[in-house]
Design a protein with these regions (language model features):
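Short, flexible loop segments at boundaries between secondary-structure elements
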Residues: 144-159, 289-303
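Contiguous, glycine/small-aliphatic-enriched amphipathic segments in soluble metabolic enzymes
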Residues: 1-137, 180-265, 269-275, 280-283, ...
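Acidic, PIN/NYN-like endoribonuclease modules and their adjacent C-terminal/linker elements
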Residues: 137-140, 146
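Ligand-binding beta-strand-loop-alpha-helix segment within the catalytic cores
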Residues: 154-184
């Protein structure tokens, strides 16, 4: 177990594609060589989708992750409460199972029984309850870590796209683009690239908010009044930040290849080009937290649920990315811990 990590896996909405992409991922034999998975789910849900997919996976039934066995698919069984899978349908009961899985896995993570957590897609509506009043996983884990800020970071190979704002309506984006907020996101981003990706002196590109990055104030003044002065101040703090760049040309001309990270101003500005470039294989990483949480870069996929056609590449990559980030953090921690300190006489 020493060379592997223990990864908690939440089932997500059982009427979506979450169970399918989890099961399909284990057809990749590398996973059990490097990762010890612990799935939180009623067994009946997995059996339903296994039959649909004609898979014959076996599970180790355990009470808690401390009993997890290496090179096995470990399962912590949750009560199903007479739940029946209705693939493609949004139901209250499916939301309850998604929350139970998330809550139990998060609890075990907080007890250091898990090394990382990989979350399957949820429906942000039917999961809502007294204990889950969030716009998504990102906000949930941020509050559970007793933090006010985190960074939604999309990752695929060397492409990394962070978001200055997360799940905001368009009309709320501009008022949220403040220098104080940008500094918080940029500092998180810079630390993440160093600690979680082992990049020294990372270079970060900022996208403009308006078309053509504002055209010197002709199409909005956020760049001229906020973003450009912010970049100048960030450089004074020895942060390697550049821009603002017009988003369309930046991605179309592959300028992202010149940087270690890109900071988009709002959700779709970053995720649309990211998903096109990553070809459905990207990973969502919640950066800036003490824990490691990743997920696939897509939603519940109700329209294809239960049909056996869901692409599991993004979920599989989320498992491997969580493992890699965990080991990179450990490497940095060990280097810092074992740093040679010279006294004044030396």
């Amino acid at each position: 177990m020493s060379n592997t990590i223990i990864a908690g896996i939440t089932i997500g909405d059982p009427n979506g594609i979450g169970p399918e992409i989890i099961l399909k991922s284990f057809t990749d034999q590398r996973i059990l060589e490097e990762i010890t998975p612990v799935i939180y789910s009623p067994i009946e849900i997995l059996e339903y989708y296994q039959k649909k997919l004609n898979l014959h996976l076996k599970y180790e039934f355990i009470k808690d992750p401390s009993k997890a066995k290496a090179k096995k698919i470990n399962l912590i069984k949750l009560e199903k409460n007479n739940f029946s899978v209705e693939a493609g349908k949004i139901t209250k009961e499916a939301g309850e199972i998604a929350f139970d899985s998330l809550q139990k896995a998060t609890s075990d993570l907080s007890k250091n029984l898990l090394d990382v957590i990989v979350t399957s897609p949820i429906n942000k509506d039917n999961i809502q309850n007294e204990k889950f009043n969030f716009l998504g996983h990102t906000e949930y884990f941020t509050e559970n870590s007793n933090l006010k800020e985190s960074l939604m970071l999309m990752v695929h190979n060397e492409l990394r796209v962070g978001l200055a704002t997360n799940h905001l309506s368009i009309k709320k984006v501009s008022p949220s683009i403040l220098q104080e907020n940008l500094f918080q996101k940029l500092e998180l981003y810079n630390k993440t690239l160093i600690k979680d990706f082992n990049i020294s002196n990372p270079k970060i590109a900022l996208l403009g908010l308006n078309p053509h990055a504002g055209d010197n104030g002709l199409i909005g003044d956020e760049e001229k009044n906020i973003i450009i002065p912010f970049i100048q101040k960030a450089k004074e703090k020895n942060l390697l930040v550049y821009g603002p760049y017009a988003a369309d040309g930046f991605f179309a001309n592959h300028n992202y290849l010149k940087f270690d990270g890109v900071l988009a101003m709002y959700h779709d500005q970053g995720l649309i080009p990211f998903k096109i470039l990553s070809n459905n294989e990207g990973v969502n990483f919640t950066a800036g937290l003490p824990i490691v949480r990743t997920s696939p870069d897509h939603g519940t996929g109700y329209n294809i649920a239960g049909k056996g056609t869901a692409n599991s590449a993004s979920f599989r990559n989320a498992l491997f990315e969580a493992k890699d980030i965990y080991h990179r953090r450990k490497k940095i921690k060990n280097l810092t811990k074992n740093r040679l300190v010279l006294n004044k006489e030396q």
